[in-house]
Regions:
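Short beta-strand/loop segment that forms part of the nucleotide-sugar
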Residues: 38-50, 74-78
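Short beta-strand-to-loop acidic/aromatic patch adjacent to the donor-nucleotide binding site
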Residues: 98-110
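Acceptor/aglycone-binding surface of glycosyltransferases and processive sugar-polymer synthases
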Residues: 84-88, 92, 113-206
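Short, well-formed alpha-helical segments that are part of the catalytic scaffolds
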Residues: 13-35
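A conserved acidic beta->alpha catalytic loop
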Residues: 45-59, 109
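Terminal low-complexity segments of carbohydrate-biosynthetic enzymes
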Residues: 3, 262-337
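Conserved donor nucleotide-binding strand/loop of the catalytic core
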Residues: 61-84, 92
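Active-site donor/metal-binding and catalytic loop motifs
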Residues: 240-264
Length: 337
């Protein structure tokens, strides 16, 4: 594991975060990494966050004091978003090293280093059993709500469900389906929005290609800022990647979030569903049927304003994806069951 694994840490912190807190989070993130990775296989990508450069270099120097050498610190002058930072780090490792496996871990310490051996073990087993390297493993959270809050947990569950339905429909047209055999030991849809994933070189290259292609196709959409998990997962599934899942630890409450437009869920989540439906050329009757069925099941519909918000996003989907077609009436909640 130590000789064959590379790791990227995208580094961005809010402008008002004290430098001491940044150093603390980075020190925690890098803690004990030398047990599982060689220093030269660790890349910190400071993503257009000048106030984080000194803390990143300080954490790298602390790491070298105990491990013998520093991880690489790459400073990007402009902010490309988490997707851009991870792509930059993966591209470096793919170009400059011979590591067989790659992962990314958040800079807030949420992705516990001691979960990494479990992800690695499953990935290697899958590679051996399947006889190819088109495999990836995700670290599944036991609860989506406690680390992120109720709203984000509900919308991530929606993303996971509709992603599987849409991708399954698209793949079925060519006689295929998503291969989730290694995910089904855990309950529910796989936690595709989890940022703690492990890739082979082949699937890491596909990850980078998916995000770079999506960004270049629609530069005005800034896919690298919001699509790191969603867009890459869709493209990997479509390409026939075999996913596996293992449970991982997570914070009870995240110390920071870089989630864009978290206070505007129509934009934060609506554009992801729009991208999915456009990418797969989903017809309106199917796309809205999936949406209607999914929102009837989520508990977000029961909070004040939640149902209206879900219908607002439904209208947004219809306008953006099928502007020339009148949408059918939305479902009704007030039925006995």
């Amino acid at each position: 594991m130590r000789d064959s694994l590379g790791m990227v840490v995208p580094v961005w912190y809010a402008p008002d975060m004290p430098a001491e807190r940044m150093r603390e989070l980075l020190t925690h993130t890098l803690g004990d990494c030398e047990l599982f990775l060689r220093p030269e296989h660790i890349v910190l990508v400071v993503d257009g966050c000048p106030q984080a450069e000194a803390p990143a270099r300080h954490a790298a120097a602390e790491f070298a004091a105990r491990a013998g050498s520093e991880p690489l610190v790459v400073v990007q002058p402009g902010n490309e978003g988490q997707g851009g930072a991870v792509c930059r780090g993966f591209e470096h490792l793919l170009r400059e090293s011979r590591v067989r496996y790659l992962c990314a871990r958040d800079a807030d310490g949420d992705h516990d280093i001691y979960d990494l051996p479990q992800l690695f073990r499953l990935l290697v087993q899958m590679e051996e059993i399947e006889g190819h390297d088109r495999v990836a493993v995700l670290g599944q959270r036991g609860d989506l709500h406690r680390p992120m809050g109720f709203a984000r947990g509900q919308y991530e569950a929606l993303l996971n469900e509709i992603t599987l339905r849409a991708v399954g429909w698209a793949m079925a047209q060519r006689g295929q389906c998503p291969d989730l055999r290694y995910c089904r030991r855990l309950p529910g849809p796989p936690d595709f929005q989890s940022g703690y994933k492990l890739y082979t070189r082949a699937t890491a290259e596909a990850f980078v290609s998916a995000l770079r292609t999506a960004e270049s196709a629609q530069p005005d959409q800034q896919v690298l800022r919001w699509g790191i998990q969603f867009v890459s997962t869709v493209e990997l599934l479509l390409a026939g990647t075999v996913f596996g899942s293992v449970y991982r630890l997570t914070y009870d409450e995240q110390p920071q979030t870089s989630f864009e437009h978290a206070d505007n869920r129509l934009l934060a989540y609506g554009r992801q569903f729009v991208w999915l439906y456009r990418r797969l050329t989903v017809p309106m009757d199917l796309g809205l049927r999936w949406w209607d069925e999914a929102i009837l099941a989520v508990h977000w519909a029961t909070v004040p304003g939640g149902w209206q918000e879900l219908l607002h996003i439904r209208d947004y989907l219809a306008r953006e994806c099928w502007p020339q077609t009148a949408a059918p009436p939305p479902p009704r909640r007030h039925l006995m069951f």
